[in-house]
Amino acid sequence: MENDELVQNMLLELRRGVLSIAVLSQLGKEEYGYSLLKALSDKGMEIDQSTLYPLLRRLESQGLLQSDWRIVDEARPRRYYVISPQGRAVLTKLKREWSSMAETMKQMLVS
């Protein structure tokens, strides 16, 4: 495997782990899929729809999100997502662990 391909594979693994935390962190208020994509993109986290929607379904099946369908302004139905109480508890722990790992990695990469 060439170095570029190896790096791409490793970055993909790293990104997968980060996306769950990123999505949970943005669902403190209700969002539908496209508005969530935009919110993530505005903060520098680009994500494809083909990645986001399966992730939302998985997080909901794990009890970390709640969702419901709504029709707003005579438009087509949209599914709105919001973090659940269990999701908030999990996000709090993940954020704490993320901070600890980031600090550790910062120290390791500087030396």
Model-derived regions, located:
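Amphipathic alpha-helical dimerization/coiled-coil segments
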Residues: 89-111
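Basic, amphipathic "hinge/linker" alpha-helix immediately C-terminal to the N-terminal HTH DNA-binding motif
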Residues: 77-95
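Short, Lys/Arg-enriched N-terminal segment that forms or immediately precedes the first helix
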Residues: 1-12
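Alpha-helical DNA-recognition elements
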Residues: 58
